[in-house]
Amino acid sequence: MIILFSLKTLGLAVAVFVTVIMILSVMLIEARKKLVPQGNVSIIVNGDTENPLLVQPGSSLLTVLSDQSIFLPSACGGGGTCAMCECHIDSGGGDVLPTELNHLSRKEVAENMRIACQVKVRENMEIRIPEEIFGIKKWECTVRSNYNVATFIKEFIVELPNGETLDFQSGGYVQIDVPVVDVDFKNMNIDPHPSDPFGTDKFRSEWDDYQLWGLKMKNPEPQFRAYSMANHPAEGNIVMLNIRVASPPPQWKFTKTPEGKSIREFDGYLPVNPGVCSSYVFDQKPGDKVTISGPYGEFFIKPTKKEMVYIGGGAGMAPLRSHLFHIFHTMKTTDRKVSYWYGGRSRRELFYTDQFREIEKEFPNFSYHIALSDRAMLEADGWTEKKDINDKDGEGYVGFIHQVLLDNYLTAHPEPEEIEYYFCGPPMMNAAVIKMLDDLGVPEENIAFDDFGG
């Protein structure tokens, strides 16, 4: 009897459980019908009621527009951190989300400004976007070359399809699509250009020391990332990028010498995925196909006659090279004083130096200044330090580039606040330059920087 009763109780419990699950499933389906329409919804763009976009609901507005070949800029790949995919949503966008309020002022919210990657398409919408967005295209490009120009930086060159051109302003950027892909770092080629006098092993020792060959990147879903172009408009139907590989955060261990001195030693990486797009790019070989879209950007040359000072480091070289090559190779500018201050850890981190020295020879109004920050490498690099800006014997300076610029030029300048400053580099460099310019009293209208190129 006890066993029979237990079986009946178990059967009743199962029946109740199944019934509850069925009720919840029906409720979920009904809720989904209310929250996400089952048919297409329409998106009216810039008041064009005659040609609305008919789309499936459920995805972000950024993704939906991309599927319709309308490519809003997004340096973070839709992660909600860069806020570059702003647009006006006049109806159908729902309430502004907390993730958007971090990037929008009260005035912008009142003007219906939204962050497209954070807005889900659930109903008919009316939106406004800048007209220049319609000039953005997407191509399947072919990799021409992919050499290392520094230890962790590639010069990545792709060719557009025959007959296609990328009409852009110097300082613009493109977005690279990254497919579902796994990348094994041991298969990467980090050779410099064949003409490099250091030879094919130039960067291998540091990759060995930092155990980069053992890293693996897994990308489970399509993504995209933004990179500033290093080429200028007159360089044909190519896109040239300087991309730094993003390794996981390193781990360190501390040991003591027999003398009791504490030494920090590299101890591998945290279990974090390497940079998705940078790993993907580093793995590309000549002939491979890569999808890019563009042009985007707002880091452009200002049409004034003011003196220009450029400050760069790392992969921040890219948009600055684009500017300077356009200024001197295309515009042939002779009536503006221009200087470029670029810093690296050691000699092997400097690149394009010969190209800028050639511009110096041709244009007396341009000067190029370089500095190394790793003092431990100076002797091995055979570096001859400049005593000051008038020292013709020294090769370059020693120190962080913003401090080198301040000590050797800006401090003695009669009106540093009247100079236009253009800069791009690692986050710490950008922050240091911003503080320096603020201390000098430079107004915002004389400051332009690219915050993701480095």
Task: Label each region the model flagged.
Residues 317-331:
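Histidine-anchored nucleotide/phosphate-binding helix
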Residues 60, 84, 126, 173, ...:
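Residue-level marker of beta-strand positions
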Residues 144-285, 344-345, 371-375:
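Ferredoxin-reductase
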Residues 73-83, 116-120:
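Cysteine-centered iron-sulfur cluster-binding motifs in ferredoxin-type domains/subunits
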Residues 26-34, 102-159, 164, 184:
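Fe-S ferredoxin-like electron-transfer domains
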